[in-house]
Design a protein with these regions (language model features):
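Conserved Nudix-box catalytic region and its N-terminal flanking loop in Nudix hydrolases
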Residues: 34-70, 156-163
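Conserved N-terminal beta-strand and adjoining loop/helix that marks the start
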Residues: 12-35
Length: 163
């Protein structure tokens, strides 16, 4: 491992180009035509979505998604692949979600206090209640030509930008 000097932050008076960022991960785990989804029960974001969680300070993104999948699903995933980024503004910063895919795993599926885990056939997606941005999220994850899902905010209006 090679050490690099840390760049000094600009002072408040010197127009800092840094911002506070909250880092999280989501992972699409597939088994053939099935995907593992979490039916979230928390009031802030209900419906079926991908499992995930926060990146701990000093933790690599790959280590974070492996740890979160173990905690949220009970599965040990191998070789997760980074396939995109979702981001949106939050008070005093930005919320960044690194989007991963995994097809290699071992273990037995468990649920957590975040919600019930369930294998869902891809042809059943239209029959279940997914979180509001699930279709756009899946579009970015599954289309190799896309890498970014961003919410743009103008006053009270939130617009989705996909690139």
């Amino acid at each position: 491992m090679r050490n690099f000097p840390l760049r000094k932050r600009r002072s408040e008076n010197n127009m800092s180009r840094t911002e506070n960022v909250e880092l999280t991960v989501l992972c699409l785990i597939t088994d053939g035509d099935r995907m593992l989804l979490q039916n979230r029960i928390k009031n802030d974001w209900q419906g079926y979505t991908l499992p995930g969680g926060h990146v701990e300070p000093g933790e690599s993104f790959v280590d974070a998604v492996i740890r979160e999948m173990k905690e949220e699903t009970g599965l040990d995933i191998m070789n997760p692949r980074l396939v995109g980024v979702k981001q949106f503004p939050i008070k005093d910063g930005r919320y960044v979600v690194l989007l991963f895919k995994a097809i290699e795993f071992s273990g037995t599926v468990i649920s957590s206090d975040e919600g019930q885990m369930e294998w869902v056939e891809s042809n059943r997606l239209s029959e279940i209640n997914t979180v509001g941005d699930f279709k756009d999220l899946m579009r970015v994850i599954n289309d190799p030509a896309l890498t970014e899902f961003q919410y743009l905010v103008d006053g009270d209006t939130w617009t989705v930008s996909i690139k």
